[in-house]
Structure formats: structure tokens, C-alpha cells
Amino acid sequence: MGKALMIQGTMSGVGKSLIATALCRIFSDLGYDVVPFKSQNMSLNSAPSIEGGEISRAQYLQAIACRKKPSIKFNPILLKPEGNMRSQVVFLGEPIGSVSARDYMLSKKIELFRKSMEVLKSLMKRHDLVIIEGAGSPVEINLKDYDIANMRVAREVNAPVILVADIDRGGSFAQIVGTMELLSEEERNLVMGFVFNKFRGDPSLLYPGFKFLEKKYGKPVLGVVPYIDHRLPEEDSLAEFPRAKGEVHIQIIKLPHISNFTDFEPLHWANGVDYVTKAEEIKGDIIIIPGSKNTVEDLIWMRENGIEDAIIEAHREGSFIVGICGGFQMLGEKIIDNVESKRGEVKGIGLLPAKTIFAREKRTNHLKAEVLWEPARGMRVEGYEIRFGRSTTRRPFSVIKWVNGRRVEEFEGAVGERTFGTYLHGIFHNFEFTEAFLNLIRREKGLEPIKIREWSIEDEINRFAKIVRESIDVDYIIEFLGL
């Protein structure tokens, strides 16, 4: 039987996901057979697994850090918020229904927890180490009885817990003490030590606080991780939507059910992006309609709030319009949806020659394609699709060449006048394509072309893990685990 190590935090947003990612790479580098795990994740951003199901982006990234193919076993329960206090429940990669928060807590949660623990124990039997990520705070008093992502998991497999605090936001010592005081004695005994994350300054200034914690709880501070400027995707529960107007003004419609907004990180890094919600704000050089958890409802929201008309007017004035997945479907001529919204046939925005019908079977695949859109014709791109929609068009954006490593020849997306839409999530992570697209608009504005500095997820994981390795006592962790 392998070992388990759990990363919990004093609150949401302390950096649990990336500390876990770093530890996944560190232990993989040390030669251990390591895999990630999170029993339940609530996320607007999902990614395809090797089995063809969905998992959260956090566990997808951690799998890469472990040098493993992303599996549905790494994130058995995925909750995808739909609005109105409802979420789609995805179990082992497959949607099993839509429930209210109350119904989920009272009915499905414990049953799914038991099944997810069977998955965790099977992983521990087959691997040297499972690095488990918790969720939010482990001591929310109103939720603790229903919490299946923190100490209940640690107790189930007797996993030592590293408690992470975000010192950048202040109050980290109080958060650690408060968390420890609200844990039961059994739970406190599972805590092996503390990590202070995102520190700017001289760590020696913190030593009096370290001594206090060690004296009070008999637990060591395992390290202080500096604030790291990085390009790894963060967990999205507390995601900030930037309002940065770059030389090319890129506006992204912040839909009520926006999903997979990690698609736009490269645009944010290369130029800056501006998320907008009001019709009067819409006047960018590039206007993007992102993916949506409920395409038709978001289209109707845009229509009722004047955003659809504002997009059409901006397009008439010369703005370039882009749609990704659900955004692509909205830009077409019509959508027939009896799956997500049950509204039947709905008129689209009409900027793309495409029609979409929603099927009950979701397509969740890794894709490699060749671009047909003229300014980037012939470029090889890759990404992934997560969709119910099936679209037909007279002018496709690209031809898919590979689906999950299997050779195919399928058209996808659509092209119109100063408009394109695609099902390829991650299209802008293809730097050659993004550079060509931005420079097309820059030339129109009389700006000099730019060269986007290429980077890879692998490089960023290695750089982040190296800093974490230098900042925490990994040898102590190895000895504590008995590896």
C-alpha cells in the first residue's frame, strides 16, 4: 500500500492547488510513482481525461506534474456551477445530473464520497504516493458535517496534512491558530506541519511566530514559499477577471455561466484583456464570447441586456468577433437545445454561417487540427473540446486531424467576415496562432508586430517546483511519510 499526503489550506485561494502541483513534480523528480487526487472540486474550468471524461483543470495540471496522463480517478466528483444555487454533478468523468446545493448535501454527497474513497484506496494500492488536495477551509462550522474534501478524506486513509496559509493577504498566523483550534483533537493529530505561502520579504522576520506555533501545537513550520510570478492556471473559485486595456483592446463578455476562461490566459499575458458585462462598454478591437455552461440562457441574457446588439454594432464598426465553444454556437444562425436549457430552437446572433443542435452525449476529447482561416491557414494547433453541441457550417475554421491520438478528418468551427468561431478550447495557447492573430489587428492599428515569448506548462511546472523545493523541508516530509 502506498502513502498519502494531503494539502489543506486555512481558506480558499491560499495556493493549495499549486503547492500540490509543485509537490507532485518534486516527488516525481525524486523517482516516486506519484499521482494527484481531490475527492470533490467545484470548478468552471474542466479538462478532458484520458478516458474521455471531465476532470478539473487543477487535477489535470497536477497529473502533468506527476508525469501521468490525466485520469477521471484523480478527481472523482466535479461540480460545475450552473447558477441559481444549482450545479451539474460529474462523477468519474460523466454528468449524472443537476442538483441544488441543499439536495446535493442531503442526498448524493455521502454516497459519492464513499465511492470516491474506494477510488482513492485503489490509487494508493497501485502507486507509491498520492498527493491529495483539500478544498477551501477544513473548519467551516456550517459546512463541516457535510465536508467530503478535507479532514474526512485525511481520516479515511490516515493521511498526514500540511496546512497552507497565504501570508500575502495578512492574518496568516491567526488563520493557522483559528484553524487548529476548530479542528478536533483527532484532526489536529493528522496535521504534520505548516507552510506559509506567497511571502514577500525576509523570512527571518517570521521566526518568533514559528516558535509560537511549534510551542503551542508541537508542529514545525515546514517552509516559507516566496511570492512567485508564474503562468500556471490558478484554481478558479476566487478567480479575478482583469480589466486591462492593452494596445489591442481585447474585450471578453463575462457571461453569467462563463466556463473555461483559462482559454484567455495567453491573451492576458501577451496583451491584456478586459472582461465586460454592459452593452455600453462594448467597443474593443477584438470582442470574444467565451464558453458557457448554459449557452442558450447566456445568449438570451446578452439579448435582453443589449449586449447582442452592441456586438453587432461593434462588428459593423470594424471590431473582430471571436466565439469559443458556446460563444461560437451563439454567433451562428440558430441553436436547437433540448439538453441544457430545454428551450428548443433559438435564433443565434447570425455573424457566422453555422447551425447547432445539442446532443445528449457530451464530446470530451483532446484535438489536433489544421487551421483553414486564411490569416493562419495551414498552422497546426491543438486543444480540447467539451461540448454537447454539434454544428454544421459552409465555411469551417479548421479541420481536425487527430482525436485522442486517433487519425480523423473532421471540420469544426466557422469563419465569417471579421469573425471566427471554434470548439477548440486552448486555441490561444498555440503561440504561433495567437501571435499571427494579434499582429493582424496590430497592423490594422498601425502598431509594430510583437513576438510572443513562448513558454510551456512543463517549463513553468519545473520552475515553480524548483522554488518550492528550495523553500520547504522535503527531507522532513519524506522521513515523516516513511518513504
From Swiss-Prot:
InterPro entries: Class_I_gatase-like (IPR029062), CobQ/CobB/MinD/ParA_Nub-bd_dom (IPR002586), CobQ_GATase1 (IPR033949), CobQ_N (IPR047045), CobQ_synth (IPR004459), GATase_3 (IPR011698), P-loop_NTPase (IPR027417). Keywords: Cobalamin biosynthesis, Glutamine amidotransferase. Disulfide bonds: none annotated. CDD domains: CobQ_N, GATase1_CobQ. It holds the Pfam family GATase_3. Signal peptide: none annotated. One of its GO terms (molecular function) is catalytic activity. Residues 247-433 form the GATase cobBQ-type domain. The active site is at C325 (nucleophile), H425. One of its GO terms (biological process) is cobalamin biosynthetic process. It comes from the Archaea. PROSITE patterns: GATASE_COBBQ (PS51274). Catalyzes amidations at positions B, D, E, and G on adenosylcobyrinic A,C-diamide. NH(2) groups are provided by glutamine, and one molecule of ATP is hydrogenolyzed for each amidation. Belongs to the CobB/CobQ family. CobQ subfamily. This is Probable cobyric acid synthase.
